[in-house]
From Swiss-Prot:
<dbReference type="InterPro" id="IPR036047">
    <property type="entry name" value="F-box-like_dom_sf"/>
</dbReference>
<feature type="domain" description="F-box">
    <location>
        <begin position="1"/>
        <end position="45"/>
    </location>
</feature>
<dbReference type="Pfam" id="PF07734">
    <property type="entry name" value="FBA_1"/>
</dbReference>
<dbReference type="InterPro" id="IPR050796">
    <property type="entry name" value="SCF_F-box_component"/>
</dbReference>
<dbReference type="InterPro" id="IPR017451">
    <property type="entry name" value="F-box-assoc_interact_dom"/>
</dbReference>
<feature type="repeat" description="Kelch 3">
    <location>
        <begin position="331"/>
        <end position="379"/>
    </location>
</feature>
<keyword id="KW-0880">Kelch repeat</keyword>
<dbReference type="Pfam" id="PF00646">
    <property type="entry name" value="F-box"/>
</dbReference>
<keyword id="KW-0677">Repeat</keyword>
<feature type="repeat" description="Kelch 2">
    <location>
        <begin position="229"/>
        <end position="281"/>
    </location>
</feature>
<protein>
    <recommendedName>
        <fullName>Putative F-box/kelch-repeat protein At3g17570</fullName>
    </recommendedName>
</protein>
<dbReference type="InterPro" id="IPR001810">
    <property type="entry name" value="F-box_dom"/>
</dbReference>
<feature type="repeat" description="Kelch 1">
    <location>
        <begin position="151"/>
        <end position="199"/>
    </location>
</feature>
<dbReference type="InterPro" id="IPR006527">
    <property type="entry name" value="F-box-assoc_dom_typ1"/>
</dbReference>
Amino acid sequence: MFTDLPRDLETEILSRVPATSLQKLKPTCKRWYTLFKDPEFLKKHVGRAEREVISLMSLRVYSLSVNLSGIHSSVEMTGMLNSLKDSEDVKISDITECNGLLLCTTDDSRLVVWNPYTGETRWIPYKSNSPYEMYQKFVLGYDNTNKSRYSYKILRCYHGLIDFGYEFEIYEFNSHSWRRFYDNSPNCSFESKGVTLKGNTYWFASDTEGRHIILRFDFATERFGRLSLLYQSGGYVDNVVETGVLSAVREEKLALLYERFDELNDSSEMKIWVTNTKIVEAKDLSWSDFLVVDSSKFMVTRMTNVMSFLVDEEKKMVVVCDTDIDQHMNRFYIVGEDIYKEVYKDIAQGWFSYWPLLISYAPSLVQIQQGKVIPGGKRKR
């Protein structure tokens, strides 16, 4: 026990202890039990937690062991994460991560927030008001204006019935309810999964002319905004396919994996950029080159349908997850200046909504705000 330590120093030390150890310490000290529920402490702990890697594969969530050691680099599945509480067979088709919480869309179009470390869940009801559910997106974020306590929200984007434009809804955990809002500023197409960083969500997107942009949704103001890219996209070009995917780097920066494939010349290039400053400090984005992959050097043409990737800045390597539609295979690659190694391959199941994902995840004790209890003992959801 740290009974002789100043309270601030004790808190500082405990904020650096892994979540697995904190969970064991909770029942040993009433003061610590209270501290481990304090939002400000949890915020500090999540920011310092050592991140783990999980993967969504074949409608299940797996923990991964990633070894980045040159020619001995590997990715191994170490086990399936425990099933969601109160459900024996939940199949998950999509995941977004925020502060150690996973927002999961199930195979039967239900929505649940899950802390896989504590096992806590909260099912979120929503009413489908569009026949185009296949094209809807959910992301989890928070209003970060209150530095001591985050106000979590869910953004739902879906195709409307008029001109197939996007419509938007917000779910607030504080009020336990959905509401629609209107914002015409996006006027673009989402080209990648959303990545939540410091409470806000970012997408690689393209405008009506095919020019690429970074789109940000601010959960505090509930407004979209456009941010700068390192390169200028010239719009649609015949026989040229350009794709981009975003990833978070140590919960501080954004990384962009960009691929350009020339179908006429059967050539491709892959570039990865990382933002120069921490997201919380930047009003706009400035980028630096991180990695350029010479496809001809490794005798590969291109990756196909890259859905997610993870960056190791120190080793200057990335782990990439993609799907080969022609061969109907899911694949993991480790890519660096001198390595391009396939480390995992498996038969893909289902359509694109079932494609695999790599997620950097920080085990945390963050609690999920539950719905109000109504007469009869059931929670209002």
